[in-house]
Amino acid sequence: MRIQEMDMREMGMSGKEQERTGKPSEAFYRVEKQLTIQLIPQKGNERLLAEVPHIRWLDLAMVFRIYREEEGCSLSLLIGREQLSDWNVTVEEVARKAMEHMPRLLPVKLCGVTEELERTAKGMGLTPPKSPEPEDGLKLYLLTNQRGYNGAAAILYEGVLEKFAEEVGKDLILLPSSVHEVLLLPDGGDSDYEALSALVQAVNETQVRREEWLSDHVYRYLKEEDRIIAAGNGTEGNGVKGGVWG
């Protein structure tokens, strides 16, 4: 499905349909179930972040979009400061509504990378590649949403990382593939986070379009603490509660 991205700051769209009160406007209630979060890197997006409502989260930032599907085409509208003013809401209120409705609007997709490659190959009429199981028994998993669009934000979905970590019985390493997806690797306890971060950097530079970069290092999910921390490149230590913006 084709997805058309638009910027509400450039469209002159506003919700000024009633006088301001202490409550959100009717326009906000009409769009609240279409609110979504896009995770982007803070670095390199300073100009954008100076102009749009956002919440900083580790070294990333949450920006907000309205996602609609109409007549075989998906529309993704970036929300500007004017919309929050017109809607009479705070950025935290937008974030809470997005967290509430996004898992239903864009359901999570979590599967093995090998299985996903096999499905893709079969769908294209190709012979699925044969991938040997890793010697350490640790599989690589793909986390995104059912549309594969801005799916890295699925790491924010309540309980997703917690439940998966419980299933595999290990902490998780999060490899930021792009703004659209994150790769998950069960942490065997002897992982080289610096080497994995170097791998992420190499993939970014050779395989990912610049505007779709998410991060140049890996993250860790600590299941006993339900917490995500940055790892690699000297970033070890700062963290936020899993599924909660900070």
Regions found by a protein language model. Give the residues of each.
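N-terminal accessory interaction module
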Residues: 1, 34, 39-51
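Generic recognition of long tandem-repeat/solenoid scaffolds
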Residues: 1, 141-143, 230
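An N-terminal, globular interaction/scaffold subdomain
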Residues: 1-35
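Intrinsically disordered, low-complexity regions
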Residues: 3, 8, 172, 193, ...
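Feature targets compositionally biased, intrinsically disordered low-complexity regions
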Residues: 11-14, 122, 136, 150, ...
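A contiguous, surface-oriented mixed alpha/beta subdomain in the mid-to-C-terminal portion of proteins
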Residues: 46-207
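Alpha-helical oligomerization segments
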Residues: 178-246
